[in-house]
């Protein structure tokens, strides 16, 4: 049972990329670094709840556009507010 080996040249075309242009959104500045921005404080749960997901997890800075310095302050304030029962650890599903 021998196979016939035929020497055919196979020409491969390079994969064509879709002609979609990628548009990047301009990254906005930190919403907590502008003048008249609210102060990050564990006693302000209305502000802190904006930076917590529906499941109760802290949102990353790439989603909230908060700078690294303010993100650390936010994380600490959320943790303290949870310990003092100002924020729930896990939100109830409705």
Swiss-Prot record:
InterPro entries for this protein: Ribosomal_bS18, Ribosomal_bS18_CS, Ribosomal_bS18_sf
GO cellular component: cytosolic small ribosomal subunit
A GO term for molecular function: small ribosomal subunit rRNA binding
PROSITE patterns, per the entry: RIBOSOMAL_S18
Keyword presence, RNA-binding: yes
Keyword Nuclease among record annotations: no
GO biological process entries: translation
Pfam families on file: Ribosomal_S18
Keywords: Ribonucleoprotein, Ribosomal protein, RNA-binding, rRNA-binding
PANTHER family per record: 30S RIBOSOMAL PROTEIN S18 (PTHR13479), SMALL RIBOSOMAL SUBUNIT PROTEIN BS18M (PTHR13479:SF40)
Quaternary state and interactors: Part of the 30S ribosomal subunit. Forms a tight heterodimer with protein bS6.
Function description: Binds as a heterodimer with protein bS6 to the central domain of the 16S rRNA, where it helps stabilize the platform of the 30S subunit.
Family: Belongs to the bacterial ribosomal protein bS18 family.
Name assigned to this protein: Small ribosomal subunit protein bS18
Lineage per the UniProt record: Bacteria, Pseudomonadati, Pseudomonadota, Alphaproteobacteria, Rickettsiales
